[in-house]
């Protein structure tokens, strides 16, 4: 069974008209989780994307990013919600459909010139990914690529990210579904 078929669809969540793609059914399954980590590992061992560290976005990006960093022998840096990091931070606000939110990274988490693979579970609007990329750049890092389990191209996040000059990779997508 492929990755896509292991992802649960929940209609009208978190609000009416939204088809929520729930990856918990994928990652709770040891075969499904292995498919994800092996698929990403293969991508970064074989496709010449040069990077030094994996950055994962809270919360599901931590699950993927830390496992991927381990398999590739890289370090892992968390991008967190406000107030969760104990040392000096840099913040980035971003737009949500219903307001704004913010993410943070430790000021010393990434050295200038460090090449970063940014990882999260799902790409929809691109707001969180672009905010995380802005954080990486504020502390002097360079985003080599952004990787996701799921891309929802109909929502437009992939186009926004590509238009900003970033590379995007996803293991699967739900287009027109």
Curated annotation (Swiss-Prot):
PROSITE patterns per the UniProt record, alphabetical: PUR_PYR_PR_TRANSFER
A Gene Ontology biological process noted in the UniProt record is: purine ribonucleoside salvage
Output the Gene Ontology terms for molecular function: adenine binding; adenine phosphoribosyltransferase activity; AMP binding
Where is it localised? Cytoplasm
- Keywords from the named record: Cytoplasm, Glycosyltransferase, Purine salvage, Transferase
Q: What GO terms fall under cellular component here?
A: cytoplasm
EC no. given is 2.4.2.7
Name the catalysed reactions.
AMP + diphosphate = 5-phospho-alpha-D-ribose 1-diphosphate + adenine
Top-level taxon of origin: Bacteria
This protein's record includes keyword Cytoplasm:
yes
Associated pathway: Purine metabolism; AMP biosynthesis via salvage pathway; AMP from adenine: step 1/1
Q: Which family does it belong to?
A: Belongs to the purine/pyrimidine phosphoribosyltransferase family.
This molecule's function is given as: Catalyzes a salvage reaction resulting in the formation of AMP, that is energically less costly than de novo synthesis.
Quaternary structure, from the entry = Homodimer.
Write the protein's name: Adenine phosphoribosyltransferase
State the organism of origin: Chlorobium phaeovibrioides (strain DSM 265 / 1930) (Prosthecochloris vibrioformis (strain DSM 265))
UniProt gene name: apt
